[in-house]
Amino acid sequence: MQDLQHVFPRLRSYILYLLALYVLGWGFTSYKAVFAGLILGTALSLYNLWNLVRKFEQFGQALDEGKKPRSIGTVVRFATAALAVVITISYPKTFHIISVVVGLMTYYVVIIIDLVVQNMRRR
């Protein structure tokens, strides 16, 4: 498997392309709340991906140095999801809750699709 540090720029660019599409959808359609929710969720998803890569790097360094590794940031990811829900509940006319949740799951889907595509290219 490729090192996460090498994969992260590719995943980040995919997510940024999705964000650009969502911004276009927000600007040119009447589904503003849905696209605003996707933008919010996907932006926080990108933060979660960046945090995950950073935590995995720290985890690997701790193992290499023989130290006890720290957590990989599960609490931070849960807190990010809670923040998204609080923002969505605070502004229900601006953000659509289901699209925020879908946006939060974006980086998982992007990772899986990238893994499948990269495995197909190697064959």
From Swiss-Prot:
One Pfam family here: ATP-synt_I
Membrane-protein topology: Multi-pass membrane protein
Primary localization class, coarse: membrane
Membrane-spanning segments: 15-35, 36-53, 72-92, 97-117
PANTHER family membership: ATP SYNTHASE PROTEIN I
Membrane is among the record's keywords: yes
GO terms (BP aspect): proton transmembrane transport
Cellular component GO terms held in the UniProt record: plasma membrane; proton-transporting ATP synthase complex
Name of the molecule in the record: ATP synthase protein I
Biological role stated in the UniProt entry: A possible function for this protein is to guide the assembly of the membrane sector of the ATPase enzyme complex.
Keyword Methyltransferase: no
Localization: Cell membrane
UniProt family annotation: Belongs to the bacterial AtpI family.
Organism: Priestia megaterium (strain ATCC 12872 / QMB1551)
Protein's gene: atpI
InterPro entries from the UniProt entry: ATP_synth_I, ATP_synth_I_Bacilli
Keywords: Cell membrane, CF(0), Hydrogen ion transport, Ion transport, Membrane, Transmembrane, Transmembrane helix, Transport
